[in-house]
């Protein structure tokens, strides 16, 4: 089990980051709520990871805090929720926002998340509400998670909008929907992370 990685950020391709650790490169998928807070390329970072082994792949999911990883693990315990959907859910909302939505039974907020229909939203509330009691009130999440700052340089590549749209598709949105929202959001001077952040806000 790989539980934590400490290394240098080599490449960022939302929602995936490539870390160099001891001469090896690790591809780590992260929810966008965590991805936004990564340092710039060339800087060192510590990521808490969840390791998934499948017949056709070995996957690493990364988080800035242990509490976010704990929530991810609670999500994948829920019937019908796999790692990909859990990643999409935590990209559409911060950990704190999700816990509060479940505690308050805000089905209308949950169904706006990629891949979450009414039945799945209801299942999340029924199966997770008791398990998540006290998570926010006991300060298990940092207040900073509610609004994370952008930490990326402005866009320079002409295909940045395409990169942002690809990231949204990877998170579960339909290609046409992703392209349409990105075309409305993207403006000169915005980073890829900024475009994704604003797109997710408008979709949720």
From Swiss-Prot:
Record flagged with keyword DNA-binding: yes
Region entry Flexible linker, spans: 144-155
Pfam families per the UniProt record, alphabetical: HHH_5, RuvA_C, RuvA_N
Domain of life of the native organism: Bacteria
GO CC annotation terms, alphabetical: cytoplasm; Holliday junction helicase complex; Holliday junction resolvase complex
Region (Domain III): 156-204
Subunit structure: Homotetramer. Forms an RuvA(8)-RuvB(12)-Holliday junction (HJ) complex. HJ DNA is sandwiched between 2 RuvA tetramers; dsDNA enters through RuvA and exits via RuvB. An RuvB hexamer assembles on each DNA strand where it exits the tetramer. Each RuvB hexamer is contacted by two RuvA subunits (via domain III) on 2 adjacent RuvB subunits; this complex drives branch migration. In the full resolvosome a probable DNA-RuvA(4)-RuvB(12)-RuvC(2) complex forms which resolves the HJ.
HAMAP family noted in UniProt: DNA_HJ_migration_RuvA (MF_00031)
Entry protein name: Holliday junction branch migration complex subunit RuvA
Organism: Aeromonas salmonicida (strain A449)
Highest classification ranks of the organism: Bacteria, Pseudomonadati, Pseudomonadota, Gammaproteobacteria, Aeromonadales
């Amino acid at each position: 089990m790989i539980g934590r990685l400490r290394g240098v950020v080599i490449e960022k391709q939302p929602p995936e980051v490539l870390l160099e650790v001891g001469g090896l490169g690790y591809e780590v998928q992260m929810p966008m709520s965590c991805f936004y807070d990564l340092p710039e390329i060339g800087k060192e970072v510590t990521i808490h990871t969840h390791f998934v082994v499948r017949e056709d792949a070995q996957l690493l999911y990364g988080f800035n805090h242990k509490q976010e990883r704990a929530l991810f693990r609670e999500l994948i315990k829920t019937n019908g929720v796999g790692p990909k959907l859990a990643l999409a859910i935590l990209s559409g909302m911060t950990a704190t926002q999700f816990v509060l939505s479940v505690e308050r039974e805000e089905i209308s907020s949950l169904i706006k998340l990629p891949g979450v229909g009414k039945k799945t939203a209801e299942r999340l509330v029924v199966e997770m509400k008791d398990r998540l009691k006290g998570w926010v009130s006991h300060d298990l999440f940092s207040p900073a998670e509610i609004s994370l700052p952008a930490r990326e340089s402005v866009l320079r590549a002409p295909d940045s909008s395409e990169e942002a749209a690809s990231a949204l598709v990877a998170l579960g949105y339909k290609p046409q929907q992703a392209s349409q929202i990105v075309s409305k959001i993207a403006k000169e001077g915005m980073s890829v992370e900024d475009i994704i952040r604003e797109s997710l806000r408008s979709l949720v």
